[in-house]
Amino acid sequence: MGKHDKKTGKGRLDKFYRLAKEQGYRARSAFKLVHLNRKYDLLSKARCCIDLCAAPGGWLQVAEKYMPKGSLIIGVDLNAIKPLPHVTTFVADITTPHCRQTLRQHMHDWKADLVLHDGAPNVGSAWVQDAFTQNELVLQSLKLATEFLAKGGSFVTKVFRSQDYNSLLWVFGQLFKSVEATKPPSSRNVSAEIFVVCRDFIAPKHIDPKFLDPKHVFKDIASLPTSITEPTDTSIAPTSSSTASAAAAAARLAANSHAHSNVYAPEKKRRHREGYAEGDYTLHHTASAEEFVRGQDPVLLLGNMNKIEFRNETEKGWLKSRHTTPDIIANFEDLKVLGKGDFKALMKWRLAIRLEIGLDVKADKTQDATEEVVVEPMDEEEQITEELQKLQQAKLAKTKRERKRANEKKARELLKLQLNMTVPDDLDQNDLALQGEEEIFDLEEGENEARRRGKNGGLATLVDDGEGMDLASESEEEEDEDEEDDEVLDSDEERERKTAALEGELDGLYDSYVERKKERDAKWKVKQDRLKDKNFDAWHGIQEKSDEEGSDDDDGQDDDEEGGWDVIAQKKAKYGEGDSSDSDSDAEPETEVPKKIKKVSFEKPARSEKSSGLMTSLREPELRAQRSKQAQLWFDQPVFKEVGDLAALDGDDEEEEEEDESEEEESDDEDVDMEDASESSSTLEGDDDFEIVPQAPEDDGPEWDVDDEDQDEVKKKVIQDKGLLTAEAVSLATALVNRKTTADKLIDQGFNRLSAHNKDGLPTWFLDDESQFYKPNIPITKEAVDALRARQRALDARPIKKVAEAKGRKKMKAVARMEKAKKKADGVMESEEMGDGEKARQVRRMLARAAKGKEKAKEKKIVVAKGVNKGVKGRPTGVKGKYKIVDARMRKEVRALKRIKKAGSKRR
């Protein structure tokens, strides 16, 4: 097919498509009805119109436009039609009784003057099948039209040119006085559609249902033999008219309607209401045996005839055949009483007789099974070319499969993202534990595996102390002791250990969830940090806390005080990383002495193979406390009294860095003493194998928090500057002012079940959830909310700084212009050359010019020389003021220059 015949998208956007867009029609097919109405005048006198298969509604728009006002217009389609003024639409299938009932409900006692049908089925690659389906749909629409059309009405339908076209025309000709086929100009030439306009409906009182049945109207009769389909004693002269041949075909179809069913299902009784065939007034029909043997359709003959006779000598000779049994002869005598098995026996007898007389030849199975295959020799180039083609096809098929697989995987991933079905990245999707086949996590197995690997290769790096002692033997002894301790653990301890492992797993999952929330929403982290520590944010702002800060922070602040959430997170990080910093570790602590020492910091010792494991001994806290007491007793000796308080030495580096320079100068002497003390203590530790463990402060006395020092003053200052910011605060303040409550009552109400909440030992994810929902609900009043909203509206009504500055500059320029105009007016009034009237006019003009300001110069209007303005001379139509005619390229350049000029201009 040529390039101009391809039905591409852009090729179908013809002038009627553009006209439909301009005139507001929903489809370009609306112009088909416009052209048909212009030729046949179908709509001007119609008072009731039915449009079958009306979506999207283009023909309904044309009918509403050209029909008289107040007419009844009804549209039916399988798809919903958007509402149109003065048009009734509903969704139904025109082949169902439901559509017929709905039409009756809408029309009441009306009869339609016009029935339109522009529908088509969903077409595919089989043209013959699609054409038959279209013609079947046309016949169904005609069936509806015969029920609702008034006498003298019109019917317009779309038909595809096919072999059933003449049958349709014959049916139309029986029901309408005038039938014309036409093709409007708006119909594409590449389309096989034509429109049949049927006028002057006859409106018969009774129509045979078979007359509108597609099985009978479109039945193929070309293959039927003449001896069966036509009587032998009558001959119908062929006519040139297609309608006459179609009428004869329909008559023959009506006569032989049940012939095949009489043979294949003879036991089923039927009531024949079709009457006698034309020219056939007898009920008993006979045929010769030769017609049965030599005929093309023996089944049709058996169904129509009553008896088969052996008339001539040839037929009587078949009676002597071994295949002609008495049962066969008896069956031929009366065909109407035979069953299905008897008809099969007659068909087998026919095949046998045809083989005897030579009409049929028995096929040789051996010859059919063996086929001679002729292989033509191929030269080398053809073989190479064929192999290359096969390889290329295989490669293309493989690439196509891979691309399809990748697209399917991408679609699945996209669907998972849309449904929030993602899983943490650190989880293995092929892990059997996730499928429930084994336990989720077992710390004991991991620890045992670590010990098996670490006995030989885990302690590859051995640390020597100052005396040259090898610590590997001591670490091995400690590992043996730990193994013995693990063996004696009972089931309760194992259960507790697994429970702790599960809690740690949940904490890890919660941490990954928090990280994903931070990545998705930037504001989420700010909100969470504000909820955790409001006082810290008020003074220092929200900032990320590193692992070092979290591990070094050991202020011992209670969780119930302000900032308790951060303390929990820091303790969690410290216990996760620094549980091994006890005296069991055999590595010597490395003390780094900076240039400017402010205090002595005892760093954590290096982690051993045991301390880096997954499990933590349950006896470790007791051992740590016991060794801490031993170390305290050791350092109570008189030798260490000059060193000072060891607990005070373990401070925070960050707090010391924030001290003033004056304090640094005063502490220089003390730093030197601290350094000496550190050296002496480390020496003693190396000699006696003791580790200095800082003692935690006692929890007996009350702690002093610097953050609580001026909190009341800070809150007062915020209220003075910004006022009450929440509806709860406004409600409480209003109640206090109106003496509905007192300060003592408010203080008493602050002590409730939600205020005393013990947070020790609770996981972070639980505490985060409790911080949102486990808090007192203070009732608020409508007046408080209205007051806050009124204040917010007042703030929103104020202009932004940029707008206010622009207005101020504009006002200053206007004042300057007015002052300048006043000075000029004074000069004019002092002039003696002009009269009083002239002076007044000059002053009035200057003041008006100053008040008005400078007028912006009108820009030239750019007119593109295309369409109606192409090649025009003089001023284009509809253009006022200054103009400039340019082409499309120059218009883009002008816009680019404006854009560059605007971007380059500096804002004052």
Swiss-Prot record:
Single Gene Ontology MF annotation: rRNA (guanine) methyltransferase activity
Residue spans of biased composition, Basic and acidic residues class: 535-545, 592-610, 816-827
Residues spanning the membrane: none
Source organism: Cryptococcus neoformans var. neoformans serotype D (strain JEC21 / ATCC MYA-565) (Filobasidiella neoformans)
Subcellular location: Nucleus, Nucleolus
Signal sequence annotation: none
Reactions mediated catalytically: a ribonucleotide in rRNA + S-adenosyl-L-methionine = a 2'-O-methylribonucleotide in rRNA + S-adenosyl-L-homocysteine + H(+)
Record's protein name: AdoMet-dependent rRNA methyltransferase SPB1
E.C. number: 2.1.1.-
Biological process (GO), any one: rRNA methylation
Function: Required for proper assembly of pre-ribosomal particles during the biogenesis of the 60S ribosomal subunit.
Gene name of the record: SPB1
